[in-house]
Amino acid sequence: VSSKVVSKALGLREASPASPEGARRHREQVVARATVRVVAERRTPRGTTRVVEAVAGPVMAAAGVDASNTGPDGGVLLLPEDPDAAAADLHARLVGLRPGTRVGVILTDTAGRAWRAGQVDLALGAHGLHVVDDLRGGTDVDGRPLAVTERALADELAAAADLVKGKLGGVAAALVRGLPEAVAPAGTTPGARSLVRTGPSDWFAVGHHEAVRAALGAPPGSVAAEEVGLAPVGPEPVEERGARAVRLAVLGHPGAGVTGSAGTGYAVHAPDPVTAGRVAARLEVALAGEDVGAAVHVAEHPGTGAPSQADRAPGSRPPLG
């Protein structure tokens, strides 16, 4: 069942202002409310796109807030805060209509995937079925033991159902037959939230740019991140990436400044040698995070008469990006 029709039934639609700018700001506010944490963010011609951990569970763009197929009055739709509970409620209603029926319910939503282009439907919520087919402990066709393989059965069913439902025909649900082994007694199996990697199992809890920026005081989704500036979704000239690294390096260090360019190298100026060295080190990290290989040195500190010994040559350390 499409989560969109469930969201409509639950009254999770919000009207948007008529003006494009007002609608954009309203959508950003709605996304923020539906967000647990920001994973990655990029600048686009239409504003800022954020990949977030949604209150609904998965990591997805814009917390799953959607402005398509919302009805003639427009607005945006939010995902149910507890999709597994919504699936359980729908399951109970279906069984109530047909007592004795063995059925599993999957709430589906469309999302992108790391490492892959395009979008697919996945299981947002589930009840009354095994969401995973755990093959660990078995053997492959050659008799070798399987130690890792767990089929995300609920996601596979969600994607298969989308081949029938499609995106443009207004079909909200599909009935999948022929998998009796996937169905389980109500309340005996984990829901779709169990498919979301969290904690130590989440190797990609934050984007690589965002990890560097967060370490230097500008975590994703923060005012500081906006002040430093966000990377765009497409290619960007090296000088713009370098300028953003400079803004990040001097963040929280009043009186410090940087001159130079990505092509000629950067000189750090500060009221005292300690601050200068600190900002220079921050700049090296920030430049690596932007994949800019440029020399960094501390300018001669007033009153010392001595040049800095903190020079770094271009390419002295591999880029992080």
Where are the predicted features?
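A structural signal for small-residue-enriched, beta-sheet-centric alpha/beta enzyme cores
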Residues: 2-8, 21, 25-67, 71, ...
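Phosphate-interacting basic helix/loop segments used at nucleotide- and nucleic-acid interfaces
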Residues: 78-103, 107
